[in-house]
Amino acid sequence: MKSIPGDIPQYLLIKAQLQARIQSGALKSGDKLPSERELCAIFNTTRITIRESLAQLESSGLIWRADRRGWFVTPERLWLDPTQNTNFHKLCREQGREPKTALLSGVLTTVPVEVMEPLQLQPFDQIYLLTRLRYADGRAVCYCENHCLPARVPELLQYDLNGSLTEVYESYYNLVYTSMHLSFYPTAMPAQAAQALGVMEGRPALLLRRLNYDQHGRVLDLDIEYWRHDSLRIEVDTH
């Protein structure tokens, strides 16, 4: 790896130059970076050095890699206020983004041990387990596992679940999300979420766990969400 006077590694200098272009607006949200080969020529360096620079920028949340397409400037993060009653599709549209949800699988299965207590179930009770992928402006940002109660939403799997679950609940069951218990913390991206999101297993992620209640104050479902580390910020105004 090359260094220059001052003993600053070249990959950090290249990172600083690319970062300055992004933060100044010369490179805008969604812009594609030159290819690794082109960057090697621009900065007169090796591909190994360029990849170190790009990895640093990715860790900072400034760029992201689309498989077989290259590197792009990361879009603005979606922001979530936990005190507001909203859903993913509404959240995106309110912030000028285009949402999409894709159902990866939907099964009736025995309740996983880790969600048995919050859902107030017994060891061999059944739940509907939905795994879904959420997109903002065509970019996969969140892998979600929805744990739904058959007693509250019978025959749920017969409906189109490639969209807002909130709207399905309201339209077919007259059930409305009104409150939730939310916990969130950084974690490592698990294998199943990493594969769906197109990132490496073990990369940083933000985990959100929501226990949702309906208008009657009863538990409705539990969501476990893995967000790309560069795609969401959480803000709460206590004024």
UniProtKB/Swiss-Prot annotation:
Q: Name one Pfam family in it.
A: GntR
User: What Gene3D superfamilies does the entry give?
Assistant: Chorismate lyase-like, Winged helix-like DNA-binding domain superfamily/Winged helix DNA-binding domain
Where does the record place the HTH gntR-type domain? 8-76
- Where does this protein bind DNA? 36-55
**One MF term in the entry's GO annotations:** DNA binding
- What's one GO BP annotation on this UniProt entry? negative regulation of DNA-templated transcription
Protein's name according to its UniProt entry: Putative transcriptional regulator of 2-aminoethylphosphonate degradation operons
